[in-house]
Structure formats: structure tokens, C-alpha cells
Amino acid sequence: MLRSERDPQPGQDIRGRRGCEPVKREDFTTLTAACAKCGTCRTVCTLYPERKAEISVARGKITLVEAAFSDRDGNAEALQEALSDCILCGKCERECPNQVAVEEIIMKGRADLAEKLGIPAWKQVVFGKVMPSVTARNATRTAATAAQKVFLRRVPTGSGLHYRFPEAFGLSGRTVPALPGKSFLGSLPPGEAVRGEVVLFVGCVFDHVFPQVGRAAYETLRLSGKGISVFRDAPCCGLPALVSGDRLSALRCVEENVKRLSDASPERIVFPCGSCLVMFRRNMLFLLPSGHPLHGEAVRVADRCVDYASFLLETDVLSRLPDRPKGEWAGQVGYHDPCHLSGTLGKGPEGREVLRRTVGDSYSELRGAELCCGYGGTFNIRDYPTSAKIGQNKVSVAAGGGAAVIATACSGCILQMRDMAARTDPSLRVVHIAELVSKAFSNR
């Protein structure tokens, strides 16, 4: 049985709701039984080269989970530390010969441990109060915009103005993008609720931090000739809460999104962010399993979800672009494979095809395109030095291959690589593919 070295702190009450019950021992046994302890995971683990420890790889974590749910005593804090020390890049799961559901094991383990040991107060506020509410997110962005001008130092980079934390903050010189005065959704004229053939789910980061991405995606989607509407008051997709173990907050976001999108019944739901997409296509079904009242609706919603690049190719939007003049784009433009989008969902070729057709001769395969950027959501907060080391290697390899612009389709990857570029090569630009598509159309 799991034991704790301290008295369990009160966490959120997440019992009694289907899809949110603590995982039973037999469920973990079923998930972990497929692991043959072959060690393939160690050869591809993003963290192992930094940690050099068995506990950092899937095999080690699964062994700990098995021990915790056996007759042997298990230390809850030690297991929580081990399961938290993972970027969730999914490389181990994709390369596993037995297809062990590593990410599911880790996410469910984190959730059960969060219930036992409690969820930190700041996470309860962010995941339970801010992320589900558009009003709360807007208020948070307004406060953060004012605070960064007072406490942080301005740093110009190739990807735009950033702010750097002073060393006194203990954040090792981390940079963050300058927050705009208005969010993407805040810049739209008043409109109706979700409707139309196609719905754009812009996501929190592309609404508040990089509104130019939301705007570029919206403007280029409209060229498809389809009726496009924006999910204006959507809760967060729920992924940050889920991977942090806050099952209840994640479930609240997921249930609201499924109900709203099911009622609207669009043909397609388009996601500029690969992390939001993987939440809808796969992870939300961990929370709404067979037997949950919303399971059927969740499956139908998931089937309609598509990434931005795939939608452009489906609707042949790029056929309207003229041939691009040779040398129009300054320097080589390459595509970074986001772990969630390219790895988990297999959507790498689509992004490359959009990029080739957009920038023409300037496209070049990115050196180290498949390398993880090291962001990992809350992992970047939990262990910034390690996250930054992995990220700096990523952008250094790409720049060393001649890249002047890195294009991708994940908000976390863009946040991370812009931060790393500000450290290693401020001239290196990191953009979303929608920004390049929008620029190409504006230059017609």
C-alpha cells in the first residue's frame, strides 16, 4: 500500500463522478502488465541523457508503480516525484514494442497521488478558477501585462519583444513574450455563439500570448469558403490540469467543451495548437470513458477535430497562392515536429507540405526536426534548468543546420523555442505556420 511521510493534505474531492474515480489497483495492473522491461524506452527517452537514472525512464517508473500497488510498502512522495519527472513527449510509448500506454499510466498515477497528497494551492487557483473562465483569464492577462512592465527587463529578439526575469527572481534568466494589450478574442467584433460549418478552437496561448497566431489562423481558414466561427468563450482544453493530476478541473473543462461543441455540431473543429488537439482527440476519453454519460458525444466531437495544416490541405486553400518568387523569404525555413502533434497523432507530413507550398524554395528540412524542445508544460516550471538545457540543444542544432526561421504548430513549443532562441541566437525566428501562410496571402 502507498504510505506518505506526512499526513495527507486535503485535496479536491474528486470521488463520485464517473470518469473521475481514483484508478483501482487492477486497472494499473492491466496497464503495466504489458511492460517486458526490455529497456527500449531508455534508448529514446528525452530525459535520460540528462538524468542518467533508471527512474527517469518509463521502465523505472512502471516498476515503481507496480511496487506501490503490490503488497510492498510504497512511498507516495517518492512515487509522485518520479512520475512528475517526465516531459510526456511520448517517445517511449511510440517506440515500445509492446505498445505500453506509458502516458496514460503516468497521468492516472499523477491524478491518484494528487488526490492522496493534495494539489498545491496555486494550481487549484489556476486550474480550478482561471482556466475554465474566459473572464478570469482576461483578468489574469491584464494583471500580468502590467506586472511585466514593472518587474521585468525588455529584450528584443528575432521573434519580437520579450521580457527577461532578473536573476534575483531565481529563474535563470528566463524570457517570456511581451503580452499584447488585447487578446485575439478581445479584438474580434461582437458575434454569436458557436455556429457554422467549421469552428476554430484557438486555445489559451494563441488567444492571450500570441494573438497574431489566432488572427492568422482565423483569416486563412476563412479562405476555405466554409462558414467559420470562433469558440469565443471556451474553457481551457484541460490538458494542463490533467497532466498535473487535477482530474476534477480537467473534467469540468472537458465536459463543458464537449456539451457546447456537440450542440453546435460543426463539420470540423480546427486546432492551431497540437497540444489542445491531442487533448480532444485522445486524452479527454481518459476522463470520459465508456459508461460516462458524455462518452458517445465525446467520441463524435473527437472525430471532427483536425489540425490547422490538415484542414488547409483538405479544403485546398493553398491552391489560391501564386508561385512564390525565389528568394522572397529571408533564409531557410524549417518545420519542428511537436511531440503531441507529429508524434502522438502522426501529423508531421501535413505541416511540412503546407510549409513547402507556402515558402517554396526557402523550405529546408530542419536539422533535428524530431528532437523534443523540452517544454513539457508544467515540467518547464518544475525543472527549468533541465528544460532549458534540452531546449537550447534543440535550437542550437536547428540553427547549426542553417535555419533562419523555425515554424511549428504547438503553443508550448513556440514558447519554449522563443525563450531558447533569446538565449542562444536572438536573430532566429520561431513562428506558427499560420503566420507564414497569412503573410504569403497578404503578399499576393
Annotate each predicted stretch with a short phrase.
Residues 3, 102-444:
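Iron-sulfur cluster-binding electron-transfer modules in prokaryotic oxidoreductases
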Residues 33, 52-56, 241-248:
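Alpha-helix capping and helix-loop boundary segments enriched in small/acidic/polar residues
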